[in-house]
Amino acid sequence: MVSIKLAEIPVQMNNRYPDLEYLCQGYETGEKPEISLSVSVEELEKERSMQDECFSDGYLETVCMYRKLALEALAHQVFVLHASVIEVGGNGYAFLAPSGTGKTTQTRLWLEYFGEDARVINGDKPLIRMIKKDDSAEFMAYGTPWQGKEGMGCNAAVSLKAFFFLERAVEPECILATQEKSIDCIFRQLLLPEKTEQMEQLLEMIDIMVETVPGYVLRCNMEMESVKAAYDTVVKQ
């Protein structure tokens, strides 16, 4: 059994294999769980059938467990976003793009450009929590043990200030996205639930988020000038 705290939620994961315990080191908590999860043998086999490669049962259990957490967390106004979130000067910026477009490259360029002022919160699948404040809302990005192939991230949280929707280009350019563009890009990076109630919970959060956190189309290359284009448009304001 693994007891951890993610996005302010104490979670109990009833695991069969040690992989999960190793993965979640540094996130442990002694608080009473608000969510309890387990993965059945049938769910493991279903996950195996969805994979192109051959993975151990222990690894597949970690994948299944995070997917189940993503769905259960919706009731706590938390969802998983396929993105790389970096913190610069206390503010959070999320890079969204199809796999292979350059999220990791841009993340590393930002780390190089901003040096000690920057850190990666989660390089692959952060948890996003909506915190309502009277007539407004804040969206916090949280690090998790699930950090992708590169293993970039930490057990920390940051307030999201902007989304960058990455597109490859020769000459860098950063422009404000419409809300319709933001919704389209964000939806492509979500785990969509099958249950109606969970889908309604997710849709409400996304609607509020695109009204609260601005999105930008960042046409970028693999050079530092892409960071400067984003910085001049968003970060230094």
Where are these regions (language model features)?
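A noncatalytic interaction/capping subdomain that flanks phosphate/NTP-handling catalytic cores
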Residues: 1-99, 109-118, 127-237
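Conserved lysine of the Walker
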Residues: 103
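Hydrophobic positions on the alpha1 helix immediately C-terminal to the Walker A/P-loop
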Residues: 106
